[in-house]
């Protein structure tokens, strides 16, 4: 059937348009680059010309001859017959990681672990006095001359005829020189002050103290039985509350004995106080 005169077949015109597109051209330039020209028909029916200029750069690198030889090997398995180089469907290309072995890597890791463990222990450690169990250093304890460290036993008095006594100037065991003021005292030293030295035997240890107690409260209670020279209430450094024990010192031991008798079992802050003489050093 012939086509009526004056009627246009758009499908045939599209075919003719596609067939009429020029072929791709490649032109080599003097500088070594290539100019590639292509033609296409867009969705709007218009023709578009695309010109690309490509310059190839050859980079030469020096590699190990063995590596270069392995690259020339014939591929096998799923890669058989494929060109040189990695194929995306069978090979996963990732970043090259440089591996540098270390001789003592295991020992270094263990040392780092030990250091971290020690730091954690020191971070959680708290200062604790060996004498009164307070949160301060033992050397700064106000009762270091009154009480002995917990677990220590006071040395026995040495007889007058023992080696290293006041009659000689040598030490008891090592044969070293002992100053005159230390002879006869087992190396403990002589306290200065003479008759003005305080009587540390008049110190009371008060336990089961309320955590809300204050030093002034204890001073007011114990001052009824004599002259109180000092009061020490152990407190927690973080919370500021009492830790449950305190020390009260009197100027006279008689007053301390009277206070110990009266205050032992005394109710304070919904708790029963336990009062006793502090152990001597």
From Swiss-Prot:
GO terms for molecular function: RNA binding; translation initiation factor activity. Residues 1-32 are annotated as: Disordered. Keywords: Cytoplasm, Initiation factor, Protein biosynthesis, RNA-binding. Residues 202-280 form the RRM domain. The keyword Cytoplasm applies. GO terms for biological process: formation of cytoplasmic translation initiation complex; translation reinitiation; translational termination. It comes from the Eukaryota. GO terms for cellular component: eukaryotic 43S preinitiation complex; eukaryotic 48S preinitiation complex; eukaryotic translation initiation factor 3 complex, eIF3e; eukaryotic translation initiation factor 3 complex, eIF3m; multi-eIF complex. Pfam families: eIF3g, RRM_1. The keyword Protein biosynthesis applies. RNA-binding component of the eukaryotic translation initiation factor 3 (eIF-3) complex, which is involved in protein synthesis of a specialized repertoire of mRNAs and, together with other initiation factors, stimulates binding of mRNA and methionyl-tRNAi to the 40S ribosome. The eIF-3 complex specifically targets and initiates translation of a subset of mRNAs involved in cell proliferation. This subunit can bind 18S rRNA. Belongs to the eIF-3 subunit G family. HAMAP family: eIF3g. Component of the eukaryotic translation initiation factor 3 (eIF-3) complex. This is Eukaryotic translation initiation factor 3 subunit G. It comes from Phaeosphaeria nodorum (strain SN15 / ATCC MYA-4574 / FGSC 10173). The gene is TIF35.
């Amino acid at each position: 059937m012939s086509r009526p005169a004056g009627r246009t077949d758009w499908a045939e015109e599209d075919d003719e348009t596609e067939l009429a597109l020029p072929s791709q051209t490649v032109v080599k330039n003097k500088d070594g680059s290539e100019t590639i020209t292509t033609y296409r028909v867009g969705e709007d029916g218009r023709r578009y010309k695309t010109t690309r200029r490509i310059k190839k750069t050859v980079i030469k690198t020096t590699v190990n001859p063995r590596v270069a030889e392995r690259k020339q090997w014939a591929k096998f398995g799923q890669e058989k017959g494929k060109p040189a180089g990695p194929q995306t469907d069978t090979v996963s290309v990732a970043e090259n990681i440089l591996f540098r072995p270390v001789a003592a890597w295991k020992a270094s890791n263990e040392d780092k672990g030990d250091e971290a463990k020690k730091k954690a222990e020191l971070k959680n450690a708290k200062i604790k006095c060996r004498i009164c169990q307070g949160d301060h250093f033992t050397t700064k304890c106000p009762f270091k001359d009154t009480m002995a460290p917990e677990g220590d036993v006071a040395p026995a008095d040495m007889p007058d005829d023992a080696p290293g006594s006041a009659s000689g100037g040598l030490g008891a065991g090592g044969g070293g020189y002992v100053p005159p003021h230390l002879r006869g005292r087992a190396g403990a030293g002589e306290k200065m002050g003479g008759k003005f030295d305080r009587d540390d035997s008049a110190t009371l240890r008060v336990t089961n103290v309320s955590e809300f107690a204050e030093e002034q409260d204890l001073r007011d209670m114990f001052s009824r039985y004599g002259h109180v020279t000092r009061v020490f209430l152990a407190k927690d450094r973080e919370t500021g509350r009492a830790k449950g024990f305190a020390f009260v010192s009197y100027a006279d031991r008689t007053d301390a004995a009277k206070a110990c008798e009266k205050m032992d079992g005394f109710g304070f802050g919904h708790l029963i106080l336990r009062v006793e003489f502090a152990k001597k050093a």
